[in-house]
From Swiss-Prot:
Organism: Mycobacterium avium
Signal peptide annotation: none
Top-level taxon in the UniProt lineage: Bacteria
Name under which the protein is recorded: Superoxide dismutase [Mn]
UniProt remark on cofactor binding: Binds 1 Mn(2+) ion per subunit.
E.C. number: 1.15.1.1
Free-text function comment from the UniProt entry: Destroys superoxide anion radicals which are normally produced within the cells and which are toxic to biological systems.
Family: Belongs to the iron/manganese superoxide dismutase family.
Alphabetical keyword list: Manganese, Metal-binding, Oxidoreductase
Reaction catalyzed: 2 superoxide + 2 H(+) = H2O2 + O2
Positions of Mn(2+) binding: H28, H76, D160, H164
Cofactor(s), by name: Mn(2+)
GO molecular function: metal ion binding; superoxide dismutase activity
Length: 207
């Protein structure tokens, strides 16, 4: 069985400064994300053993652990691609038009997304996703690493609101972190995800 691996980043840890510090990015990538990758592989190994032993209680436990750690791995893999030292500004083209259609304007979208991030209780993510059934953009608060985002949503843009993503630099002032995040958003990546979602995901759930 192939194992999950920690992806390399497209930029150096310090490349997002002053908006997100190199120290945070290094710890975030080599410690936190790496822990989720290990957790996925450990859960898969334990799940295989539990199935061989027909231990249903252990199967359910490790399926739950797999969902959490795989969620963490997927979320962070998107996170690193969503960021760029050349980011910021606003989206263009079809993505910009879709944002205007769904939210009224980019400024209204940004306000709604920021409110989702700043208002999240506990740990989680704010997510801009594409609803493959309704063919529309929606925002969500993702709880922990895998809860509260419905099936059929393809994530396009995420901001990590776990404290490890910002506390060393911004302490408890989450709003300053979210404001800084907009300076490093890789809209080219978000546009690429949007194009793939709209062209490849139609009919996958409801044919």
């Amino acid at each position: 069985m192939a194992e999950y691996t920690l992806p390399d980043l497209d930029w150096d840890y310090a490349a997002l400064e002053p908006h997100i510090s190199g120290q945070i990015n290094e710890i975030h990538h080599t410690k936190h994300h790496a822990t989720y990758v290990k957790g996925v592989n450990d859960a898969l190994a334990k799940l295989e053993e539990a199935r061989a032993n027909e231990d249903h209680a252990a199967i359910f436990l490790n399926e739950k652990n797999l969902a959490f750690h795989l969620g963490g791995h997927v979320n962070h893999s998107i996170w690193w691609k969503n960021l760029s030292p050349d980011g910021g500004d606003k989206p263009t083209g079809e993505l910009a038009a879709a944002i205007d259609d769904a939210f009224g304007s980019f400024d209204k979208f940004r306000a709604q997304f920021s409110a989702a991030a700043n208002g999240l209780q506990g740990s989680g993510w704010a997510v801009l996703g594409y609803d493959t059934l309704g063919s529309r953009l929606l925002t969500f608060q993702l709880y922990d690493q895998q809860a509260n985002v419905p099936l059929g949503i393809i994530p396009l843009l995420q901001v990590d609101m776990w404290e490890h993503a910002f506390y060393l630099q911004y302490k408890n002032v989450k709003a300053d972190y979210v404001k800084a995040f907009w300076n490093v958003v890789n809209w080219a990546d978000v546009q690429k995800r949007y194009a793939a979602a709209t062209s490849k995901a139609q009919g996958l759930i409801f044919g």
